Regions:
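Alpha/beta enzyme core
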Residues: 1-119, 130-135, 139-147, 151, ...
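Short catalytic/ligand-gating loop segments at beta-alpha or beta-beta junctions
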Residues: 122-127
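C-terminal alpha-helical cap/extension of soluble enzyme domains
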Residues: 138, 149-221
Length: 221
């Protein structure tokens, strides 16, 4: 019922043209389209961006009007993957734990004012739970300086015009932690039904927490 077209890595006019083309085709079949404006750092679907480029609020009205997209993914400081920020971009608490920079809620507010009521999307918003990082690293993994978006910032975003928040990396971390822990405890096992069961349960636990306690989307399906 919906698709996402990410032309954010293209020059602005090319992004507009590509998104408009997808919208015109998809709308023939009643399919809604999510466009994207602003670049997130990281790797997604083999598209690599070394640095984030924040969404420019002055472009959003023109982009939405010309493309006809139904929702808009923006860049306000999130990024793809489990290593969302370099140590140099972060501060550290008294225990040496990395504290990521805050999201640019000022940009979000300005976009909301220019597009009142329009559905906004955040990609690259996994929190990278440190308990999963710890389990992975204690069981053969090598996730160095992995840090994500604090949940309190996601709660704030979810209370705004943001209607969709992508947290794929958190799910990957949950399953990987469960699988690594399983094999470290039972290295002689090889039946997928045995190690995927705990992985699914951990994934279920994670998303239940996110839906109920962070994203505020419980009961809204």
């Amino acid at each position: 019922s919906s698709v996402m077209i990410d032309g954010s890595h293209l020059p602005y006019e090319e992004n507009v043209a590509l998104t408009k083309q997808v919208v015109e085709y998809a709308h023939q079949f009643g399919v809604t389209v999510e466009g994207e404006l602003g670049v997130l750092a990281g790797v997604e679907d083999e598209v690599v961006a070394e640095h984030s480029n924040y969404t420019q609020p002055e472009e959003v009205i023109d982009f939405v009007t010309r493309t006809g997209c139904d929702s808009l993914a923006i860049s306000i400081g999130t990024s793809h993957g489990a290593n969302k920020f370099t140590p140099e971009q972060c501060t550290r608490d008294e225990n040496g734990i990395l504290i990521p920079p805050p999201l640019r809620f000022d940009i979000l507010k300005e976009i909301e004012e220019k597009l009142p009521g329009f559905p906004i999307v955040l990609h690259g918003s996994s929190s990278v739970p440190q308990e999963y990082v710890k389990i992975i690293n204690e069981n053969g993994g090598k996730l160095k300086d992995a840090v994500g978006i604090p949940e309190e910032q996601l709660r704030k975003a979810a209370a705004s015009a943001v209607c969709k928040i992508n947290i794929d990396s958190d799910g990957r971390l949950a399953m990987t932690a469960a699988v690594r822990q399983f094999f470290n405890t039972d290295p002689d096992k090889f039946d997928p039904r045995q190690y995927l069961g705990p992985a699914r349960e951990e994934l279920k636990k994670l998303y239940t927490h996110k839906v109920v306690n962070v994203l505020g989307s419980a009961g809204k399906a």
